[in-house]
């Protein structure tokens, strides 16, 4: 789905790219939230934030799920100080019928960039936590 969106984007098909990327975000909502939950748990985020993220996974309405977690995203996953899920929801909620193909192409590019950055931040956060735990474990085993 993502690759189809990327192909449309490269070909300048804004509405097509927008629709494919919207499907990626909506279809992968639970998976994205699961990764965010892993980061939240790894960094010992407040229990309320983790509970909100878990509840959003059960929510069938994409918009409601995003509204429910707008304050639950760990700081280290913010992009330019902004919640990436809120940014994505804001772009996606406008709908293709309200925009020209050119505008949809710009939005599709923005959605792809935010998705990519979120994926990188998730990967780095989980890797950093694993590496830190290993380092602490190794240092604790050193003889006194």
Outline where the language-model segments fall.
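A short mid-domain helix/strand-loop element embedded in enzyme catalytic domains
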Residues: 1-4
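Amphipathic, oligomerization/interface secondary-structure segments
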Residues: 9-144
């Amino acid at each position: 789905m993502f690759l189809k969106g990327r192909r449309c984007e490269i070909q300048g098909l804004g509405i097509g790219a927008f629709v494919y990327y919207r499907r990626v975000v909506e279809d992968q909502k639970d998976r994205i939230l699961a990764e965010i939950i892993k980061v939240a748990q790894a960094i010992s985020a407040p229990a309320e934030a983790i509970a909100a993220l878990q509840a959003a996974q059960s929510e069938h309405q994409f918009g409601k799920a995003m509204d429910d977690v707008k304050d639950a995203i760990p700081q280290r996953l913010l992009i330019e100080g902004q919640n990436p899920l809120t940014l994505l929801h804001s772009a996606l909620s406008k709908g293709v019928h309200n925009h020209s193909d050119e505008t949809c192409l710009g939005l599709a590019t923005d959605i792809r960039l935010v998705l990519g950055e979120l994926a990188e931040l998730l990967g780095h956060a989980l890797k950093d936590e694993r590496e830190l735990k290993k380092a602490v474990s190794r240092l604790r085993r050193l003889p006194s």
